[in-house]
Amino acid sequence: GSEMCIRDRIKDPKSRVLQIQGPASIDIMKLASSGKIDENMPYFTSNFFDLGGQTLYVSRTGFTNELGFEIFCDGFKTDHLALWDYLIECGKPYGMQFSASRAMTIRRIEGGIFGNLTDIDTTITPFEAGLGYFVNMDKDFIGKDALIKKDKRTCLFGITCKTAVPKAGSKIKINDKQVGYITAGVPSPTLQQGIGYVRFYEPNDYINKEIEIILPDNSSHTGVVVDLPFYDKEKKILNAEGNIAVKN
């Protein structure tokens, strides 16, 4: 057989992204695009649109598990300040507010979205990450033989804690034995408690089990293992069929 080597050079396109996320995002983008973007734009689709006199690439995607859009600039061709001012003005009637990446991180964890190289990496299989439904074992693909031999059970779950916010790197113990660690954790305004992801060393039946969380300060807290996502398992929010019910 012959060998083939493919080399590709990936360049930074100098493109940066703004996200408009939340239940009013369709109305805001409809206004910003003069009606060209509306509720008929399917999820995970994209196209070029005129936003305030500038042509920009817009996708109906996001990193929040919310109804929303991402707007990609065209490098130095984009007048970023003008775009920012235009979008802020379009969002005013709908109460849109600026939020930093921390807010996005909270929402992506609440929504059960994994971060590459933080929650998942090349040392975990799709099955261990709970993403086995994306793998079609009836087809041939690179790595299939290795996956056939692997355990198909999940090692990555959600965790809730009423007395503390789980911190990345925190140890997870069951019966005084370390069985895993926290990959990411945040305070959840939706669930009114600390939440995060726990990665176990071995697959097992962990759902609804109480575990011990050892934070970096060595304090001990009780947590409960839960299935992901933490809420909206039917994805009604993404399909504009519902909104978050924040607990008071």
Range-by-range predicted roles:
Residues S2-E3, R7-N248:
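Conserved, structured C-terminal
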